[in-house]
């Protein structure tokens, strides 16, 4: 874990004596008295940090040293700030000492929060910080607001209950001040008039928009300049925490001035006529509040409602600013980020005050119309879709175009964007109930959604684990099963789709991917287009699936395809867990046929095929156990599968479970429609397969069948014979011959001696049972009350009652 040298230093730090430590403290205090930063001072601070951090318990430093280290937090040397902050984090704060918030910087702010012993210490610290926001220059040194506000936000994130009604009112007013009334001039502007330029040319320049024009409105995060004032930085900080504030802290207050929705609608509409008559902040001591007049309507609003109104205006201005063409590419990305945040904040505001919906929707609708043709704004349009989902019904707007864009175009064209994939799937997961109510058609787009999984399986698997159950419906169950089984093919097709647009069409004599040539070939275009479909409903699967698998044979080793194949079994289990809750017996019978058919129609990936067969085996057993009548309903297909000897070698796991299901549930006790003729037909099919595999060697390239297959066939024959006694001589004769054959030595169909012993033992057990048909039927086909006993529930059959009766009889005189 540590090198030998590091372990030695840690050991020395832990074993240092108190006397030596006190001398070290005194020497360090003397070093801190010098103004210059020496190497000895830096080494001593490093050593002090090692001593403090290597011990289990925190130490208390001498007060003089503690004060010197605290003073270093405001040192011009960044290195000293970092070292002093690290040392102080490892110490206990002096008892009873007030927190120093006069000269906050990033290191000092982090230290204040880290030295809070528990949540109980946070309310006092929060109150002290909030009080510092009210300090005026005339009252003394003003702490740095740029570090105070983020620290307050961090405390409230950990402990929202720190906030009192008075604190909330103050912060609401301050946020209004910072958001709406930051200065509109920039600092640091250089004069362009030379030495003889007049005072007018040296006046502070106004802030500018991203397109370079002079800003004619209030300052926002999208305004630019050569430098920014503190209140402009506070504007940026306030906007960055605004959504969290609205979601978390607005519910704390008990606002007595809240009016009903109709009154708030009337008040809010009064603000939409003009922004020139805006009220100014009412924070006590604010210069702005002393020189500005408030409108009559704004006086009716509480601080909470005023913040809501100013937030609305701020977001509206941001959306307008994003119409401008930015001069820098980085500013274009900033516009997108601000659009996302602005729309999310408007969504929060409308959820809090529904009357704002009618003022907000025209702008949101115009924003969607402007951005919907440019898919580079896809991540911006997702919050717009969220707004439509949350408020579209109230505003009575048609959302069909929004859902068509989001569900159809985004996954089809941007499946390889990992950030959009995360945002898109998160949008679906968080809004499942709302989408099922407002846009139930979203389940039709599951072939499109699965493109995210096919492209980036490990990153989004967890999302689909949550999302898949909502996509399983009676109408889509069969097609969804086929689509899940074709996930590796879809992954390969998406790779080919991207390569076909980037790689040139090769010359006839050059070497290229056969699958890429097939993708470009019009003959096979329909196969790939089916996989790339955006909506369900065009068919459950395709007829030439084996041809598609041959075309994609080389893709079986592509890393992306291999990763995708590993996720399919997980999702299939989730699929079947859901489908049994929504499907009727007719649909479940169809799914059994699909499993039998698709067990032989999978992309040639040995590990993948083995895992899918294991899933099919498990789920087939489960479906038949839930609905035994399915075995009779699908008896012809099951018998056809079980009667094909090749399935023993290629689909061993599925075959074994099909045979077991036939032997277990093909019985009159499970379904009254089960006739002797059906039992005999099944017996003859299984008998022929068992005779064939035990009388000859496996086909070339195949291994000997597992003993589990043979013993399952033998048990199934014995079960069927116990239900039709005319068949007992036939199975008894076969079991006797099998025992005699194995006595002659090794056999070609079983290469392991232990396996052979297990097979013979099972045969002898079955043969002994069949000698007494009544016992065989009771053991091999027990009645329902034996399979599902209720003795622990039936007091008349309870064992304690019987023991009590026997005890009474034996002890009676």
Regions found by a protein language model. Give the residues of each.
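Extended, charge-rich alpha-helical scaffold/interaction domains
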Residues: 1-813
């Amino acid at each position: 874990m540590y090198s030998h040298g590091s372990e030695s230093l840690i050991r020395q730090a832990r074993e240092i004596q108190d006397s030596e430590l006190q001398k070290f403290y005194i020497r360090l205090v003397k070093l801190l008295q010098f103004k210059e930063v020496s190497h000895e001072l830096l080494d001593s601070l490093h050593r002090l940090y090692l001593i403090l951090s290597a011990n289990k318990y925190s130490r208390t430093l001498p007060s003089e040293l503690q004060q010197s280290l605290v003073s270093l937090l405001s040192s011009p040397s960044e290195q000293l700030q970092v070292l002093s902050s690290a040392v102080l984090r490892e110490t206990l704060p002096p008892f009873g000492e007030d927190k120093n918030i006069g000269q906050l910087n990033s290191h000092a702010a982090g230290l204040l929060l880290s030295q809070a012993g528990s949540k109980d210490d946070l309310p006092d610290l929060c109150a002290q910080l909030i009080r510092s926001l009210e300090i005026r220059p005339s009252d003394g040194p003003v702490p740095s607001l740029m570090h105070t506000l983020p620290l307050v936000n961090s405390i409230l994130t950990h402990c929202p209950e720190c906030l009192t009604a008075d604190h909330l009112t103050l912060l609401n007013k301050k946020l209004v001040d910072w958001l709406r009334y930051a200065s509109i001039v920039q600092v640091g502007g250089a004069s362009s008039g030379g030495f003889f330029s007049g005072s007018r040319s040296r006046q502070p320049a106004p802030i500018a928009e991203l397109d370079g024009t002079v800003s004619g409105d209030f300052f926002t995060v999208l305004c630019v300049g050569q430098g920014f004032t503190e209140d402009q930085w506070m504007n940026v900080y306030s906007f960055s925490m605004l959504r969290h504030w609205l979601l978390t802290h607005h519910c704390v207050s008990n606002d007595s001035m809240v009016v009903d929705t109709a009154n708030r609608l009337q008040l809010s509409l009064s603000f939409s006529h003009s922004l020139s008559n805006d009220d100014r902040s009412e924070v006590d001591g604010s210069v702005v509040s002393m020189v500005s007049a408030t409108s009559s309507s704004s006086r009716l609003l509480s601080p909470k409602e005023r913040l809501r109104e100013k937030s609305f205006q701020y977001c509206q201005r941001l959306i307008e600013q994003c119409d401008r063409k930015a001069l820098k590419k980085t500013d274009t990305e900033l516009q997108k980020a601000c659009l996302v945040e602005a729309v999310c904040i408007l969504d929060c505001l409308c959820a809090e005050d529904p009357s704002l919906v009618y003022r907000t929707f025209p702008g949101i609708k115009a924003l969607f119309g402007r951005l919907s043709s440019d898919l580079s704004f896809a991540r911006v349009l997702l919050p717009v879709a969220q707004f439509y989902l949350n408020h579209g019904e109230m505003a009575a707007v048609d959302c069909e175009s929004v859902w068509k864009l989001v569900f159809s175009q985004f996954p089809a064209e941007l499946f390889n964007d990992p950030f959009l994939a995360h945002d898109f799937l998160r949008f679906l997961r968080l809004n499942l109930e709302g989408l099922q109510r407002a846009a139930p058609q979203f389940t039709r787009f599951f072939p499109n959604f699965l493109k995210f999984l096919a492209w980036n399986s490990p990153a989004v698997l967890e999302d689909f684990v949550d999302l898949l159950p909502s996509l399983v419906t009676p109408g889509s169950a069969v097609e969804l099963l086929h689509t899940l089984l074709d996930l590796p093919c879809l992954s390969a097709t998406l790779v080919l789709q991207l390569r076909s647009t980037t790689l040139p069409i090769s010359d006839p004599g050059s070497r290229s991917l056969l699958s890429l040539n097939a993708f470009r070939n019009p003959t096979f275009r329909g196969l790939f287009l089916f996989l790339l479909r955006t909506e369900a409903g065009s068919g459950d699967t395709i007829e030439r699936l084996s041809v598609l698998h041959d075309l994609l044979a080389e893709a079986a080793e592509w890393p992306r395809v291999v990763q995708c194949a590993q996720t399919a079994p997980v999702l299939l289990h989730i699929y079947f867990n859901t489908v049994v809750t929504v499907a009727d017996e007719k649909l479940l019978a169809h799914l059994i046929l699909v499993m039998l058919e698709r067990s032989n129609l999978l992309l040639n990936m040995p590990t993948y095929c083995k895992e899918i067969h294991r899933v099919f085996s498990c789920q087939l057993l489960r479906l038949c156990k839930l609905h035994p009548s399915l075995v009779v309903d699908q008896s012809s297909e099951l018998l056809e599968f079980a009667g094909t000897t090749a399935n023993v070698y290629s689909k061993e796991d599925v075959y074994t479970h099909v045979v077991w299901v036939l032997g277990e549930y093909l019985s009159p006790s499970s379904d009254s429609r089960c006739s002797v003729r059906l039992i005999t037909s099944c017996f003859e099919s299984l008998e022929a397969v068992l005779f064939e595999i035990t009388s000859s060697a496996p086909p070339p390239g195949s291994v000997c069948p597992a003993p589990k297959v043979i013993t399952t066939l033998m048990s199934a024959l014995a079960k069927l014979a116990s239900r039709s006694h005319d068949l007992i001589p036939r199975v008894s004769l076969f079991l006797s011959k099998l025992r005699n054959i194995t006595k002659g030595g090794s056999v070609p169909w079983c290469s392991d001696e232990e396996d052979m012993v297990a097979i013979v033992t099972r045969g002898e057990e079955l043969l002994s049972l069949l000698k007494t048909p009544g016992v065989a039927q009771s053991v091999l086909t027990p009645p329902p009350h034996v399979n599902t006993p209720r003795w622990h529930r039936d007091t008349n059959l309870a064992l304690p009652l019987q023991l009590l009766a026997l005890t009474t009889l034996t002890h009676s005189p």
